[in-house]
UniProtKB/Swiss-Prot annotation:
Transmembrane segments: none annotated. Residues 120-316 form the ATP-grasp domain. This is Formate-dependent phosphoribosylglycinamide formyltransferase. Pathway: Purine metabolism; IMP biosynthesis via de novo pathway; N(2)-formyl-N(1)-(5-phospho-D-ribosyl)glycinamide from N(1)-(5-phospho-D-ribosyl)glycinamide (formate route): step 1/1. The gene is purT. PROSITE patterns: ATP_GRASP. The lineage of its organism: Archaea, Thermoproteota, Thermoprotei, Desulfurococcales, Desulfurococcaceae. It comes from Ignicoccus hospitalis (strain KIN4/I / DSM 18386 / JCM 14125).
Length: 402
């Protein structure tokens, strides 16, 4: 457990280097700055959100081994914080061997980026419930795997996020095409796909769970789950609310799954464990991110400490007694409709007239269709009231050319 904090930009400072500098990273940087940490923000493009609040910034290809290693060795940070999936994980493994602290650890980052390795860990090693699944190395194996798990089946790249490369297949022909799409749209190099049972989803939860140093050892703490919803045909986060509107039995099962998976991954910091609640009553592990989760943006309004504050404290080796859920809250993303450079946000005044509403405008340098440009947050006496407020405010906003 850490007892001393230094001063940024002096020889006493603790230094954090973010690999990925999006909107989630920006909130982490703000929390680190509050603790006097010197922060370096790295991303594949300039003027990314977290770069706006960091002390220094670098633009590199984060999938390139040498570029990742070079920027870390140049800055020599006390902690490396991966904020996105598109990172060369072999570089992180080797940097950890050199003595650098990777959050939560290089093994966890590498496993969670790979759907096949993650499913093996969760279902086969830890033994938590998941959908039926099989792995495919070619088009014919994808068709055979769909026969095994049953049609319709979901085909996903070994490495991807936010629905990229997903196909719902109802025939062997569609399964073969789905495999080709999975490889084409994978993030990074991918030669395999995972084929999963298609389930009718009733609810989707994020079981935010963190590990911190209490001074007497590492403790794992599950938080009240966040619930989120994606309109039909949309795979990315669109709207979330907190606490989840599910019964206590589902909450307990979700927390139990999350704790088991997170303990196996180890390290320090917060994890976003994605849970599916099916219409036939099953509570299933889906995926996990070893970092703050986009659906957890709602905790900026709902909790005593947001997921970002928790992450910042935990990765610095500071204790984080379980924070309170202060109020029901909801979030809704602000999406762009077209490519614009630079983009501006119109309708802000009217949106902020809605009681209980806050806005985070990420100030990304350019937009494209359906790019997440901001998020609205709202509190209320109930989740339903918070959702009504955030949806009403969203109706006023539009991303436009400046």
């Amino acid at each position: 457990m850490r007892e001393v904090l230094g001063t940024a930009l002096t020889s006493s400072s603790q230094k954090a280097l973010l690999l990925g500098s999006g909107e989630l990273g920006k909130e982490v940087v703000i929390e680190l700055q509050r603790l006097g940490v010197e922060v370096v923000a790295v991303d594949r493009y300039d003027r990314a959100p977290a770069m706006h609040v960091a002390h220094r910034r670098y633009v590199i290809d984060m999938l390139d081994y040498d570029q990742v290693v070079d920027v870390v060795r140049r800055e020599r940070p006390d902690v490396i914080i991966p904020e996105v999936e598109a990172i060369n994980t072999d570089a992180l493994v080797d940097l950890e061997k050199e003595g650098y602290f990777v959050v939560p650890n290089a093994r966890a980052v590498k496993i969670t980026m790979n759907r096949i390795e993650l499913r093996r860990l969760a279902a086969e090693k830890v033994g938590v419930p998941t959908t039926r699944y099989a792995f495919a190395h070619n088009e014919d194996e994808a068709a055979e795997a769909c026969e095994k798990v049953g049609y319709p089946c979901l085909i996903k790249p070994e490495m991807s996020s936010s629905g990229h490369g997903h196909t719902l297949a109802s025939s062997p022909e569609e399964a073969r095409e789905g495999f080709k799409r999975a490889l084409k749209e994978a993030r990074g190099k991918s030669e395999r796909a995972i084929v999963e049972e298609f389930v009718e989803i009733d609810r989707e939860l994020t079981a935010l769970t963190y590990r911190h140093d209490t001074g007497n050892g590492i403790e794992t703490v599950p938080l009240p789950p966040v619930e989120h919803k994606r309109p039909k045909g949309i795979y990315y986060y669109y709207e979330s609310w907190h606490p989840a509107t599910v019964n206590d039995e589902v909450v307990k099962k979700a927390k139990d799954i999350a704790v088991k998976v997170v303990n196996e991954l180890g390290g320090l910091g917060i994890f976003g464990v994605e849970i599916l609640v099916t219409k036939d009553g099953r509570v299933l592990f889906s995926e996990v991110s070893p970092r703050p989760h986009d659906t957890g943006l709602v905790t900026l309004a709902s909790m005593e400490l947001s997921e970002f504050a928790i992450h910042a404290r935990a990765v610095l080796g500071l204790p984080v007694p379980e924070p309170k859920l202060l109020t029901p809250a909801a979030s809704r993303v602000v999406l762009a409709e077209e490519a614009l450079e630079p983009p501006c946000l119109k309708g802000v005044g009217e949106a902020l007239k809605v009681k209980g509403v806050q806005l985070r405008w990420f100030a990304k340098p350019r937009s494209y269709k359906e790019r997440r440009m901001g998020v609205l947050l709202a509190t209320g006496s109930t989740v339903e009231e918070a959702l009504e407020r955030v949806r009403r405010a969203a109706g006023f906003l539009k991303v436009v050319k400046c």
